[in-house]
C-alpha cells in the first residue's frame, strides 16, 4: 500500500488507486514504478499521477523488454531502470520523457540507483 502524509496535519491516507509496486521513483507529481515478482513472466512498468490519483499506462512506449528490473530512478524528466540477475553485471536502461530508450549501458553487479550530479557555476 502506498501512503501519503499531509505535511501540515501529518494525516496519513492511502493512495488506493496506486498499483502494486516492487520499486518506485518520484518526480514532478508522478510515480514511476515497476512490479516484478519471482516467477512472473514479465514485469509491469507503470505510472501513477499523484495529483489526480490515477494509474497510467507503461512509461516504456517503444517495446523495450526488461526481464529482471532491480531499481528505478527518475531524474530530469528521464527514467532510469537498472536490471540485474544477481550474478552477472547489470544494465541501466535510460528512457526519455517520451518513453523511448535513448541509452543502455553496463553498470556492474546489482546496480542500485542512478544519481546525476549537476555542474554548478564553479
What are these regions (language model features)?
Residues 17-29, 65-75, 107-121:
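Repeated scaffold domains used in trafficking and secretory/extracellular systems
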Residues 70-73, 81-92:
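Acidic, glycine-rich flexible loop segments
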Residues 35-38, 84-86:
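Short loop/turn segments immediately following the C-termini of beta-strands
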Residues 30-34, 78-82:
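Conserved beta-propeller blade signature
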Residues 1-32, 38:
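Acidic, serine/threonine- and glycine-rich low-complexity intrinsically disordered segments
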Residues 1-4, 40-47, 87-93:
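Structural motif
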Residues 15-16, 59, 105:
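Short hydrophobic alpha-helix segments
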Residues 6-10, 48-54, 95-100:
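Short loop/turn segments that connect beta-strands within beta-propeller blades
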Amino acid at each position: 500500500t502506498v501512503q501519503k502524509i499531509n505535511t501540515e496535519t501529518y494525516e496519513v491516507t492511502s493512495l488506493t488507486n496506486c498499483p502494486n509496486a516492487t520499486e518506485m521513483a518520484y518526480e514532478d507529481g508522478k510515480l514511476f514504478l515497476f512490479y516484478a515478482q519471482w516467477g512472473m513472466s514479465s514485469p509491469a512498468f507503470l505510472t501513477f499521477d499523484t495529483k489526480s490519483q490515477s494509474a497510467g499506462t507503461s512509461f516504456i512506449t517503444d517495446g523495450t523488454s526488461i526481464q529482471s528490473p532491480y531499481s528505478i530512478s527518475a531524474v530530469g524528466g528521464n527514467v532510469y531502470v537498472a536490471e540485474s540477475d544477481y550474478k552477472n553485471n547489470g544494465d541501466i536502461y535510460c528512457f526519455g520523457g517520451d518513453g523511448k530508450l535513448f541509452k543502455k549501458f553496463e553498470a556492474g553487479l546489482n546496480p542500485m540507483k542512478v544519481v546525476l550530479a549537476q555542474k554548478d557555476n564553479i
